[in-house]
């Protein structure tokens, strides 16, 4: 009887361990998807500049268009609704991400190089060109019954590269 109990315990332990490893691997995959989506979205957004401002070599962001572009690219890469950022059916996410900070530094409000510091989000960067700073909070889904979803904050700094 004791060997049956031991075998049963080992089977339960193996399934529990497998579930924990699966959850950790899925969290890693989702985190990399978030990072890649943030890079793509910010790269797209920093290209939205006022066309006439590039003629003199001092580009100025069209902030409204850049914000819309950021949201659209982020949504397309993460399975979210582009206007509300709410998760679409079959999305990895169950909670809409929140853009908690979005700042634009260009020739209208800074000279370069510009030293940007935001202690709240751990950003300390020297901006050599017009740049966008965006911070988004994501609720990471859980794939294990005993692991609660948790929130991560992802900061991103992206500079205008020109055309």
PLM-predicted stretches and their roles:
Residues 13, 46, 86, 144-150:
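Generic alpha-helix signal with a bias toward terminal, lower-confidence helices
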Residues 105-107, 111-163:
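Low-complexity, S/T/G/P-rich flexible repeat/linker segments used as non-globular hinges
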């Amino acid at each position: 009887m004791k060997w049956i109990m031991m075998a049963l315990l080992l089977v339960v332990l193996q399934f529990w361990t497998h579930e924990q490893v699966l959850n950790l691997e899925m969290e890693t995959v989702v985190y990399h998807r978030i990072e890649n989506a943030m890079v793509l979205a910010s790269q797209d957004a920093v290209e939205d500049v006022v066309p006439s401002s590039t003629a003199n070599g001092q580009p100025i962001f069209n902030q409204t268009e850049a914000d819309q572009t950021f949201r659209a690219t982020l949504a397309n890469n993460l399975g979210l609704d582009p206007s509300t950022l709410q998760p679409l059916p079959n999305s990895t996410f169950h909670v809409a991400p929140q853009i908690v900070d979005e700042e634009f530094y260009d020739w209208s409000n800074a000279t370069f190089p510009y030293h940007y510091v935001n202690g709240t989000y751990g950003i300390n960067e020297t901006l050599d060109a017009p740049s966008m700073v965006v911070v988004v909070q994501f609720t990471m889904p859980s794939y294990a019954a005993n692991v609660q979803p948790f929130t991560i904050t992802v900061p991103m700094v992206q500079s205008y590269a020109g055309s």
